Amino acid sequence: MGGGRLPPLWLPLLIAWSEWGNCCLDAPPVVRSPCLQPVRDRNRERNPGSPQLLPYGDRLEVACIFPAHDWPEVSIRVHLCYWPEIVRSLVVDARSGQVLHNDASCYIAGGRWRFEDGGAAQRLSLSFRLITETAGTYTCVLGNETHSLATETTALVADVHDLRHSDRSCDLAFGSRSQTRYLWTPDPSRLRSINCGWEGERHRVVHYIPGTSGLLPSCEEDERELCVPFISQSIADNNCSRRHRVDGARRRYHLRRDYWLTDPKIGLLAAGSVALTSLCHLLCYWCSESYRRLNTEEENEAAEETAAGEASAVAAAAVSEEEQQRE
């Protein structure tokens, strides 16, 4: 060895351990790496669809599959809910498989990464335990010498804190299928809740999916700016608000079908309309009868006058004949 100093015996083990992404003692960050630059214009990060609520504490894997050797760099970009202003990145050279930058796996609970070259396609994966501190968005990013391209974004939620008012009783319902912008879970029947007590006039309930690790979410909630849009959009369309809309539609339907029993004012208005119509009909009938009676009386008087005139004429003719006979 030429009298040189031998490397420590633990260095190969450390290097092997680092290759699997369990330590952040990797190569220094490549500041000029396109995958570390903000994704702008038409290549900006895509809005994540269908945030998923998965079993709390279970290990899961986020995998990005890329065309082989089409892009020199591949990356997984991480935005955690608790630290949305901090971006963690795992950047790998797609040609050599060497890590260029990694501040993601060591800051994520149980984080491990792996890069696989399958010939036609390459696969970069990041596995970790899903807990409150690891919830967030995981974006697959491609990079070359000029720009970067976000291909897919996965949003993961570990638990949901629901503050309920005392005058409302709502059951938060999650769907079993992916719906854009709304939180969903593959198995809604496994949904459980933790009663965290009262905060003023509101009741805090934490919803989660039990995992095999036995870990439970905490009732203490810090500021989670990144996860708030996912959760609030889901709660805005939850079972409670749907029930209110259905009840309102049902009330309007019964109002149209049976307004007599539903609203006394509408019944009184209808009765008044019927009474007014009947009165108008009676007045019209009285007027028509009066007019007919008046016409009948006039006709009778005219007939009597005609008959009297004829009788007078006959009498006058008879008198004139008698006078002629006497002469």
From Swiss-Prot:
Residues 297-327 are annotated as: Disordered. Its main location: host cell. The keyword Transmembrane applies. Residues 305-319 have a biased composition (Low complexity). Keywords: Host membrane, Membrane, Transmembrane, Transmembrane helix. It comes from the Viruses. It is a single-pass membrane protein. It holds the Pfam family UL141. One of its GO terms (cellular component) is membrane. The chain crosses the membrane at residues 266-285. It is found in: Host membrane. Belongs to the HHV-5 UL14 protein family. This is Uncharacterized protein UL14. It comes from Human cytomegalovirus (strain Merlin) (HHV-5).
